[in-house]
Curated annotation (Swiss-Prot):
It comes from the Bacteria. Its main location: cytoplasm. Specifically methylates the pseudouridine at position 1915 (m3Psi1915) in 23S rRNA. Its EC number is 2.1.1.177. It catalyses: pseudouridine(1915) in 23S rRNA + S-adenosyl-L-methionine = N(3)-methylpseudouridine(1915) in 23S rRNA + S-adenosyl-L-homocysteine + H(+). This is Ribosomal RNA large subunit methyltransferase H. Keywords: Cytoplasm, Methyltransferase, rRNA processing, S-adenosyl-L-methionine, Transferase. One of its GO terms (molecular function) is rRNA (pseudouridine-N3-)-methyltransferase activity. It is an enzyme of class 2 (transferase). Belongs to the RNA methyltransferase RlmH family.
Length: 155
């Protein structure tokens, strides 16, 4: 199974790239994890936000292809680390690759939400999207460590 983080936004601060890459390199070869960045639409004071969201959503869904789609969204289901490890095991048994979608400043398009098989909430707080990339990578790595009895996670 391959994990894919599909996120709106490019040009992240160095600390985001450093943190994300640190966890990316830790993933085992049998569970590769990749980042696909979708360029954010231009948002000016007269921008058509619905059109921008729709375009970003089309690009995200095209990148995900036939993968299982999991959106990251505040109203999603909050999983603690053991629950995420259980979900990771279920995803592996499903046999498909998994695309986790992170929207732009206004969130995800209705099409992305409709295509999602699951929606995961990292927090009831609104988190900066660059930080979410690092949190997701670390959380998935920690979940993997639980499923393989790797010493990274300690109870």
């Amino acid at each position: 199974m391959k994990l894919q983080l599909v996120a709106v936004g490019t040009k992240m601060p160095d600390w985001v790239q450093t943190g994300f890459t640190e966890y990316l390199r830790r993933f085992p070869k049998d569970m590769p994890f990749e980042l696909i960045e979708i360029p954010a639409g231009k948002r000016g004071k007269n921008a058509d936000i619905k059109r921008i969201l729709d375009k970003e959503g089309e690009q995200m869904l095209a990148a995900a292809g036939k993968n299982r789609i999991v959106t990251l969204d505040i109203p999603g289901k909050p999983w603690d680390t053991p629950q995420l490890a259980t979900e990771l095991e279920r995803w592996k048994l499903d046999g498909r690759d998994v695309s986790l979608l992170i929207g732009g400043p206004e969130g995800l398009s209705p099409a992305c939400k409709a295509a999602a098989e699951q929606s995961w909430s990292l927090s009831a707080l609104t988190l900066p999207h660059p930080l979410v990339r690092v949190l997701v990578a670390e959380s998935l790595y920690r979940a993997w460590s639980i499923t393989t009895n790797h010493p990274y996670h300690r109870e």
